[in-house]
Amino acid sequence: MRLKDRVALVTGAGSGIGRAIALRFAQEGARVIVNDVKQETAQETVDAIASGSEATRGRAIAADVADSGQVKRMFAEVDRDFGALDILVNNAGIAEGAPGDREKIRARSEARMGELMGGGPVTTHWDLTQEMSDEAWHRMIGVHLNGTFFCTREALSLMARKNRGAIINMSSVAALMGLEAAPHYSAAKGGILAFTRAVSREVASRGIRVNAICPGYIDTPMTRPMSPVSQRLIIARTPLGRWGEPEEIAATAAFLASDDASYFTGQWLSPNGGLFIG
């Protein structure tokens, strides 16, 4: 077991990729702290960990990573009850910045696809940036980028005690290629990549490694509401011809958290089925 007895905190682990990472880390022997914005969903992941192994137990802590006060309280609890932190996965994220975003994008996506399939012209424009509210922009940046910063800041204080640790930031293929239907999401994920590079240089002398994962389209509760038309288009654009599974991202995270990746820092790995090749 590559992570035996290490203390790992995974944010946004109530479902999807985060839950898969928490389960994989537990299988690898880690003591897993499961964070989610809702206590009940975090506890569901902890219960899943317990059902898989009597020797490994998880711990649920609810906190909104976009709130620095809640993040500070979460890490104080980690320090009090575990006394150390070896691994942090900044995974918490959202798909829409404001109510109605998803429906707007879905409607325009279907309209544009219908126009394309009909031979054009395409008269439905995205127009998302010019219509975006301050609320939508700040919420998206707040959860993804601010949350990554808040959690990393607190984690470094714990990891610096032993001059050892691994931080994994969840970026996205959107940071590499840009998504026309999600300018705020693309910006947040791009910021996470730049933050990863900078912090990796800053803390390398302490033996702390910082890397990122840039998943392609993964089958999770956050992506399933996409329109059938959009889902088919994504598969058509992906050379491997399918969506990824959360467990495939979890395997990547387990590698980066382990000593197998001891010479990796400031890097990004992108399991995306060939959607982006670069």
Q: What name fits each language-model region?
A:
Residues Q39-E40, A62-F75, D134, E247-E248:
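The beta1-alpha1 cofactor-binding region of Rossmann-like NAD(H)/NADP(H)-dependent oxidoreductases
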Residues I94, I105-F149, I168, I192:
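Catalytic Tyr-X3-Lys loop
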Residues S172:
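Residue(s) in the substrate-gating loop at a strand-loop-helix junction
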Residues A95, M177, A254, T265-G278:
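Short C-terminal tail/terminal secondary-structure segment
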Residues R2-I33, V199:
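Canonical Rossmann dinucleotide-binding motif of NAD(H)/NADP(H)-dependent dehydrogenases/reductases
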Residues R164, A204, R209, P239, ...:
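Short, small/polar-rich loop/turn modules that mediate ligand/substrate recognition or access, typified
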Residues T152, A188, T196:
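Active-site helix of classical SDR
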Residues S157, R201-E202, S262:
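Alpha-helical segment proximal to the catalytic Tyr-Lys
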